[in-house]
């Protein structure tokens, strides 16, 4: 079965839903101050995940709390890398990263940014990334010896990109978010069997882990349903 990953620590310390989600997931992507979170919230969720034997990734983002890291921002490479350092410094002994939001999407289509990011990962002793299997980030990171956990999304709708590969529908567009547990479970069944139906077209999609966004209206109920399959 696919591993369940979830973004945590984006709403402060001891958030009721986040605390409950820890019981049902395999991987926690912990916010570290770029788009949300703080040293205190990161420490809190690291400790909680360790107690529950949950794998931890640093949820690295553009430094843009105003837009929750969901917009591509113009930023000099040096300043961006310094922000990555500051975010990652909140953790000790963590060697896995999942990019967040706009950074995640941009890394999968911008080869220059992907090379910059992978170079930073190598210099920071990061040896594992959670990302789409179809983007340039996965391809380049693998060529540099970084392990890729291929990710799919269970409560987000999919469309096809210019290369006929599955990509999540951008937020704000019709069918971008799945707000029914039943529909999300049907999508999980497809992904668990190595494909996804996009507008009636069956597309191969091999993934290792599925993401549940903690701020989804169905996050907790969906995580519980998946865990008890």
Model-derived regions: residue spans:
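Acidic (Asp/Glu)-rich catalytic clusters
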Residues: 19-23, 42-57, 92
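Glycine-rich tight-turn/loop motif centered on a GG-T
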Residues: 28-35, 67-81, 111, 163-178
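C-terminal alpha-helical cap/extension of soluble enzyme domains
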Residues: 167-229
